[in-house]
Amino acid sequence: MNDRITIEGRDGEFSAYIARPKVLPAPAVLVLHEVFGVNTDIRGHCDELAEQGFIAVAPDLFWRQEPGVDLSVTSEPDWQHGLRLNQAYDRDAGARDVKDTANVVAKLPGCIGKVAVLGYCLGGLMTFLTAARYGVDAAVVYHGGDTEKYLGEVDGLHAPMLMHLAEEDEFISKAAQAEIKKALTSKPNATVYSYPGQRHAFSRHNGTHYNAAAAALANGRTSEFLHQQLR
């Protein structure tokens, strides 16, 4: 069942999309969006996770700036709109929002209390920051933009983390990827996978650079990881 819920955070209320599995109780996964908001792709990822047996929740990270953002990945004006939102986005406040969402979701009827965080691009960075600052049960990062700027916080990572990097990512340079990999080698609970020949958002269904084989590999690894960590 798919629906909307309201998250009461420390800084205010905001909405979230929720997809529930057929069988409850179940663990939960927060799905953190890219610069396009809680759009068709993000809702689709939630629906797929629900089919795999998870309660999937996608909070509206842009609620302070523009509640209800739902942009198209194929529209140039929407791209520019999303990039402007991203530039003005308060990442510190955003990490608090994610943690508040996790706290609320852990107590939802039908949730066993375990909550992982999974994010794409901006959402990937917010997954990293939330895990480092507040702790989560598990974390999955898909091509988290600007992660290299926050590697000084890596010591705060204690939860199991899975990270997916596209080797030809036009938004995360090879040098930045090398920095990320080096920093995470000190964390035995972190696993980084690189995908040769892949560009940014290769796992996004409607993305320009979508690659079905690479997406299936990454998503299969994610599914296995989540089932292992949230049992």
Task: Describe every region a protein language model picked out.
Residues 1-231:
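N-terminal cap/leader regions of alpha/beta-hydrolase-fold enzymes
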